[in-house]
Amino acid sequence: MEGHIEWFRDQVIFLTGGTGNLGVCLLYKLTLHLPTKKIFVLCRGSVQRALDKLEAAMAEQFDDVLDSHRVQFMVGDTSKPSLGLKPSDLRQLQDEVTVVINAAADISLQQPLHLSIQTNCIAHLELLTLICGFSRLKSFLHVSSTSVNSFLPDGIIEERIYPLCEEDPDPEKVLSHILHAGQSAYTENFVAPYALCKYLAERLILKQDNLPFNILIVRPSLIGPAIRDPYPYYGNDEGMPLHSAIYNLATDPDYGLDELGKGINLDAVFDEIPVDLVANTCLAHLAAGSIGIVQAAGSLYAASTTGEITNTMIESVAPMAIEKLRRGEIRQSQNLAPMFYQVLERYMRTWDIRCGRSEHLKEHTGVLGLSLDGHDAKAFMKHRWQNVTNLVFGLSST
């Protein structure tokens, strides 16, 4: 893997979504683990806002990232023409950038289709158009999601595009209808509107012909806390759907701990992967010159069933907290439990998400490897849920 690490020495990277869950991990690795020449980070609102988010996410590593003197922040917005960049900033990107990593997304499961299509499809297509003017660009990495295939029946899911239905409608026509009508007949086939939007983005990005740079699409499954980088258990709850779901379901009197397992397939594998393994997958495939679709799912880590996760979580909650929950003393102010329950019902399926293009990385330790040497997945999960239940309920069993 040494050659792959050295590849970064000549790369100037433009990163969107750099203050998000995956983006922070990518930025950490690009600055402190890899000899990356330079990283431009798009930040919305102000540079100070981005710095505050980065410091909150990785307080102990924050100064080292800045002290690398290889990170330059640029104020902009993926929803605006030309990313809302100053003309001088855009010219600098056009002249210097060799790799674009698009990790920006709005993963809200509540966002209606007519809004999600703008942030999770249109913005990506406009970014692709913009970067066609980057004179030194070699590769475009677009971060997608395995949820793009949530319309499929149970079974094997390969690293490829699947048609929406037997007739396979033109994705441009599907997009046009959504923009005109604000809805789609295909929405209900997906776990959430977000997933349909990401599906269309994939189809339309890969439909582009004769581009002068490589296109790589990485599909993570649900992202979980880091096992190593930037530190164990790194990750904010907003970027980890399972934590949000547990919090809202467990604290809702109509669901609660006693009802968590009812109506959900407890034997289904809960497909989740640590955020740092997703980052390693992205960066290793970039350096290898991979193109097309790469999946980063639970098979690259340690599979757990929904029942195992639920039992471990319940065992981590102190009896006093359980009684408080049952008496309704611990409540969530927003009534999001029905939405999360519906999503879990749709998501808890017997899909077998294949990650064949990355299996070889499990044999490699180090910066870009996926080896689990020295990592105890069961102990990690137990400690993780002790941390989560302590934060959610204020108490833990230990």
Where are these regions (language model features)?
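Glycine- and acidic
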Residues: 11-12, 105-115, 182-191, 202, ...
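NAD(P)-dependent short-chain dehydrogenase/reductase
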Residues: 156-177, 193-195, 199, 203-270, ...
